[in-house]
Regions:
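Alpha-helical secondary-structure segments
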Residues: 124-131, 162-166, 206-207, 234-236, ...
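Ligand-site clamp/hinge motif
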Residues: 196, 225-270, 423-425, 431
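Detector for C-terminal structural segments
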Residues: 2, 42-43, 214, 288, ...
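Gly/Pro-rich hinge or "lid" segments in bacterial periplasmic/extracellular proteins
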Residues: 179-232, 236, 365-366, 370, ...
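N-terminal lobe/hinge region of extracytoplasmic solute-binding protein
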Residues: 51-102, 133, 203
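Short, well-ordered beta-strand elements
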Residues: 44-54, 96, 106-109, 128-132, ...
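Surface-exposed binding/hinge segments that line
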Residues: 43, 110, 144-189
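Aromatic- and charge-enriched surface segment that lines or borders ligand/interaction sites
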Residues: 96-141, 164, 248-251, 309-311
């Protein structure tokens, strides 16, 4: 379904004149919700019910890194700059427009007047200033998004509608994206903001806010009547917990819930011909991988965790990678419902996807055995190699007990590693435990996966040495405990490169470096397998519009625009949720300004520029 969300032109311009003109165009094209929010959904409006099969780590946006929680929090908090549903393009979020200085180091964001938090308090630039500075000044609040601010020198609210972010150097990524802004009047007086659960009667800026959460009852969210784009057409979103995906699928069949995501291929195929149910295999923005512990260290370089020391040897890590047949896992476990992988950036982002046939660590057990032989790992009489201390080379493989594909993959991986003389013990744990253990280095191998955002900067940033956590797991977040100063330099180069072609090449080089370090064996890019009750709901907005996903979007769009069957004629454009006048003004305004914008763009020749589990 094509979204009705307003999608103004990109607003990243070096010319303040052009930015101002486009800001005007965007303001005219967007709904008049900032001035007069729509009334809340009617009392009889349904709530959208989704299956919750993954773990919630915390609903604190400064700390949460699990994918399931991120899906919840994206409905509650907006960043300054959002990603649109049409093509993951930059669109207004909490800010209505933005501009940069000529040297690219000063970004000025303008917030509209009259927008409100869900409790009725005004949204101001001071909220954004407090959020950014809280992360910059408190190491305990850096876990989720600290790496996004590596180049930020200062953040200041000049007045209630103007926020200025000053960078130490120009950077390619818009500093207003990704980071959720929280209400200062709720968070500033907390004695321990890092320990705040944020799980009851919360306050947000997005289309829905959390009313309550507990592990047994799930998450209950209600529509935000003050949402600046206009209130949603549903009363809220409820995340109903199920022990596993089989139970969730049965609940979808009986009508207990409306949407299930994270389906296994077998479940997806079984639902394809079910009456009143529609399936969607969206192009995935996630990669599936096996993380390999290279010797975890804390932020100050102190060894931590209980990883097998043999994995500190690059030859062993590379041999492990070569022993794993990703093509077989894609065909047998995923039933082909995905794409072959190279690096960490999926094919859905062609600007940064590492498209190469030169993969020296592809499946090759003979080469893996030769590598281990040459590295001095002798084969024992029982077919298990000996490490450098003369002990059998045995590794632990950890996965999530909530994901059936993890055990299925482990059943393949164990004998494959045996073929190269490595014994493997397999243990499936709760998702939260897998996260905790992997964070502090208590693993050898583990199944992992990350949802990737439209810009690769964050994903690359969590591979820097500075992304390593404290000994207790607090502080920064590291993808796989990788640290290489040469990679850090490459990250900084792509981070600051404003030429798109050059930056794309640097991003691909960075993926190549991670690949050859063999700390992350990327297996495949899985399609997002979802199903919903089409007897109750009109087709959902997908992101991107062509072949995209319903759940796990970079934004709230599918939930915000959810429309019960029979009400599609009332949906109209989002701008129409307040009044037809708003829509007419928006369209007319955009047309009137278009000529001015085109003129300014031609005249100034301003260059435009273009997300763990």
């Amino acid at each position: 379904m094509t979204p009705n969300i307003p999608h103004p032109p990109r607003l990243r311009f070096r010319s303040s004149t052009a930015a101002a003109a486009l800001g005007l165009a965007a303001a005219l094209a967007l709904p008049a919700a900032a001035a007069a929010p729509a009334a809340a959904a009617e009392d009889n409006a349904p709530a959208l019910k989704l299956a919750l099969t993954g773990d919630i780590d915390t609903l604190n946006p400064f700390i949460s890194i699990l994918a399931t929680t991120s899906n919840v929090l994206r409905l509650q908090y907006e960043p300054l700059v959002a990603y649109g549903a049409e093509a993951n393009e930059e669109i207004p979020g909490m800010a209505e427009s933005w501009e940069t200085s000529e040297d690219g180091t000063v970004w000025t964001f303008t917030l509209p007047e009259g927008t409100k938090w869900s409790d009725g308090e005004p949204i101001t630039a001071e909220d954004a200033e407090w959020t950014y500075n809280a992360i910059l000044d408190n190491d305990d609040l850096k876990q989720a998004n600290g790496s996004l601010l590596s180049s930020v020198e200062s953040v200041e609210a000049e007045d209630e509608t103007t926020l200025v972010i000053t960078l130490s150097e120009a950077q390619a990524v818009n500093p207003g994206t990704e980071l959720p802004i929280v209400p200062e009047h709720v968070w500033a007086d907390l004695e321990d903001p890092a320990g705040y659960g944020n799980d009851k009667d919360t306050v947000g800026s997005g289309p829905f806010v959390v009313d309550s959460y507990d592990k047994a009852a799930g998450v209950t969210m209600s529509a935000n009547p003050n949402y600046w784009r206009g209130a949603a057409k549903i009363s809220g979103v409820t995340w109903v917990p199920y022990k596993n995906s089989d139970a969730a699928v049965q609940a979808l069949r009986t009508g207990e819930i409306d949407i299930v995501s994270g389906l296994t291929p077998a479940q997806f195929q079984a639902l394809e011909n079910e009456p009143n149910i529609t399936t969607n295999a969206g192009t995935g923005r996630r990669y599936q991988a096996i993380g390999i512990n290279p010797g975890a260290q804390t932020a100050d370089g102190t060894p931590m965790g209980d990883g097998n020391p043999a994995l500190q040897d690059l030859a062993v890590r590379q041999a492990v990678a070569m022993a794993i047949d990703s093509d077989t896992l894609l065909a047998k476990v995923l039933q082909g419902l995905g794409d072959k992988a190279t690096g960490e950036i999926p094919m859905t982002y062609p600007l940064y996807h590492w498209d190469t046939d030169e993969l020296p660590l592809a499946y090759n057990p003979d080469a893996a055995n030769k590598l281990l032989d040459e590295a001095g790992y002798e084969m024992g009489a029982d077919g298990i190699r000996l490490d450098k201390e003369g002990k059998p080379l045995s590794l632990r493989l950890m996965g999530r007990n909530s994901d059936p594909t993890h055990q299925q993959m482990a059943d393949y991986v164990k004998p494959w590693l045996r073929e190269i003389g490595i014994d493997t013990s397999v243990e499936m744990k709760a998702a939260a435990q897998v996260n905790d253990d992997s964070t502090v280095g208590n693993y050898d191998l583990y199944f992992t996966g990350w949802g990737i955002g439209p810009d690769p900067d964050y994903q690359l940033s969590i591979n820097q040495c500075s992304s390593r956590p404290n000994a207790d797991g607090t502080g920064a977040t590291s993808e796989n405990n990788y640290c290489d100063p040469a990679f850090d330099e490459l990250f900084k180069a792509q981070h600051a490169e404003l030429d798109q072609e050059k930056r794309s090449e640097l991003v691909m080089q960075a993926q190549d470096m991670i690949y050859n370090a063999a700390v992350n064996k990327v297996l495949y890019y899985a399609n997002s397998l979802e199903a919903y009750r089409s007897d109750r709901w009109e087709p959902f907005v997908t992101q991107p519009a062509e072949g995209g996903v319903i759940t796990s979007q970079n934004g709230p769009w599918s939930y915000y625009e959810a429309t019960p069957v029979g009400e599609l004629s009332d949906a109209g454009a989002v701008a129409d949720s307040n009044s037809n006048t708003g829509l007419v003004i928006g369209v007319a305004g955009a047309v009137l300004v278009a000529g001015l914008v085109a003129f300014l763009l031609i005249r100034r020749r301003s260059a435009t520029a273009d997300d763990r589990e």
